[in-house]
Amino acid sequence: MERIKELRDLMSQSRTREILTKTTVDHMAIIKKYTSGRQEKNPALRMKWMMAMKYPITADKRIMEMIPERNEQGQTLWSKTNDAGSDRVMVSPLAVTWWNRNGPTTSTVHYPKVYKTYFEKIERLKHGTFGPVRFRNQVKIRRRVDINPGHADLSSKEAQDVIMEVVFPNEVGARILTSESQLTITKEKKEELQDCKIAPLMVAYMFERELVRKTRFLPVAGGTSSVYIEVLHLTQGTCWEQMYTPGGEVRNDDVDQSLIIAARNIVRRAAVSADPLASLLEMCHSTQIGGIRMVDILRQNPTEEQAVDICKAAMGLRISSSFSFGGFTFKRTSGSSVKREEEVLTGNLQTLKIRVHEGYEEFTMVGRRATAILRKATRRLIQLIVSGRDEQSIAEAIIVAMVFSQEDCMIKAVRGDLNFVNRANQRLNPMHQLLRHFQKDAKVLFQNWGIEPIDNVMGMVGILPDMTPNTEMSLRGVRVSKMGVDEYSSTERVVVSIDRFLRVRDQRGNVLLSPEEVSETQGTEKLTITYSSSMMWEINGPESVLVNTYQWIIRNWETVKIQWSQDPTMLYNKMEFEPFQSLVLKAARGQYSGFVRTLFQQMRDVLGTFDTVQIIKLLPFAAAPPEQSRMQFSSLTVNVRGSGMRILVRGNSPVFNYNKATKRLTVLGKDAGALTEDPNEGTAGVESAVLRGFLILAKEDKRYGPALSINELSNLAKGEKANVLIGQGDVVLVMKRKRDSSILTDSQTATKRIRMAIN
């Protein structure tokens, strides 16, 4: 009672009432909030209030010698009174203006180099074009995006070492600079930053921006490359969007884009080879993107895309634990299941063996143009909430979810036989068979699914079998939402295994990825992709195969010619001749091969008919399995430029043209290299008869000691090798034959062998 009376008395005074009603700070919690702790609670207000004062800045005492007390207008620049609690001087904002105009100048040459990322951003914005603002509902979903355009892809540890080496070279501590990119960057930066006067800490901070990828989990509708993310606040709000075209590209976006294209091409090509995993690794290791080894990029680049992840898995790197189906990334958010094989009958009474997931599970599905939440039980879809950019995208997501649910009505909706094959002509697994079938035509699936009346829920509408929205009815369990489903935010990576058919599994044996999941979308890479592997010659079409095959023969002629004379079968089996076969009509392959092999055998048997150019020209044709026939050809046809073109067995043609004067070969008008030897050597007087019983292997090989005279050869044991002096003082390596039966042919081949070994 006493308290209330006291309060009443206080309230009766007009001053009390005024304080409590007119002033906003009338709550102890608020007073506490603004007065406790060192952290400034309202920086903007504090700044305005400070700047309204005469001397809001404090500076070191030395400033009094460097700045006059008054400026040209007679305004005071600093006060003689000390700053309370320190021995600093109180300074006016006008002093800053004076300093900027009249203070000492320093070299600005390093600024664009240190603040490179900022200067480049200004250029991009200057040249970018902003389009009209449109008001519409924005379906944003959170994605992990790169917020830092123009960076290299170093790990933070690698970057730390580079920064210490460049900015603080005299600091103690071991620094390990191993990767090629680390060394290149360190060298460039040390040169750039010689005599740099900018504070080292600032340099280090800016330098970090150039080296390390920074990602954030942000709501995005539209482009996700870093040059779009840097203007996110300008291009999309809650209910509006502004069209924008960046005024420049940055290397990190180009690397991401080119990496995806290279990985897709490699996975597609590997899938059709005899040993997909070995081929994939061979291609990843021999490919460069923008001059950097693809394997180095894969180790550092966090891009998550099906093909990229398959390549990473093959290299033994960790990848995200989400799995891919029908081009959507699935992440299980709750529930669990066990897998069991089950046989089911399609509407066409075809038997399929599917791995059924038994149990209740919830998933998020994220695709490029649609996202969804899926709740399912054993072979039953309970609920699917979809959102997408347009009708088509929403339909794609619904089909994938319906197939994934493994419901009986979906399997019964199959009309006709399922016999889809992959690029290697192998049948797809049953789940992908079903997916392909309904992706081609989902009419029966949607019609058979069933519809149900729906409740009116905010932000959700129904969708009918013809994919039109409806507020009363909807496909059973399916709703369309205005809100997108966020991408899985975690950056956790898991250990995976990969089999030789490129199927990637987690440690519990669940398939996360397979070549069927790799997109067929073709794009043009921003950076040059150099595939050194012969498996990728086809990627640029038949002409490239032709030129590359001949270039390869010429580059490796030294070893090729020895194999040609000693072990032709091994030579014909080389994978470098594989792509070439696709240029020759199936019907002619065997006949051409038989003809060329016979011709080659005659060259080996008959003295003086050895013709380097002709061997090079015909060699690729001999790689196909030969047919024994008596057919003779004067020209062989290859399919390039959309039609058959002839390669003449004797003589030049537009396809294969050898210029004797320059010793250069052109294939389809493109230079294919130079022959280092004279292809028409005269027959040297070789003591071939004396070399009976010996096999000529190669040029002199110093490891086998000094050259013996021909008489000394007789002391060699069978299978022993030695260098021997022949004819015009040339030295060749020979081996004494293990069998005597082949002695007859030795004298015939010796001439050609010697000639080859000498050259």
Swiss-Prot record:
Influenza RNA polymerase is composed of three subunits: PB1, PB2 and PA. Interacts (via N-terminus) with PB1 (via C-terminus). Interacts with nucleoprotein NP (via N-terminus). Plays an essential role in transcription initiation and cap-stealing mechanism, in which cellular capped pre-mRNAs are used to generate primers for viral transcription. Recognizes and binds the 7-methylguanosine-containing cap of the target pre-RNA which is subsequently cleaved after 10-13 nucleotides by the viral protein PA. Plays a role in the initiation of the viral genome replication and modulates the activity of the ribonucleoprotein (RNP) complex. Keywords: Cap snatching, Eukaryotic host gene expression shutoff by virus, Eukaryotic host transcription shutoff by virus, Host gene expression shutoff by virus, Host nucleus, Host-virus interaction, Inhibition of host RNA polymerase II by virus, mRNA capping, mRNA processing, Viral transcription, Virion. Its main location: virion. GO terms for cellular component: host cell nucleus; virion component. The gene is PB2. Belongs to the influenza viruses PB2 family. This is Polymerase basic protein 2. A motif (Nuclear localization signal) lies at residues 736-739. Signal peptide: none annotated. HAMAP family: INV_PB2. One of its GO terms (biological process) is cap snatching. The record marks E627 as: Avian adaptation. It is found in: Virion; Host nucleus. One of its GO terms (molecular function) is RNA binding.
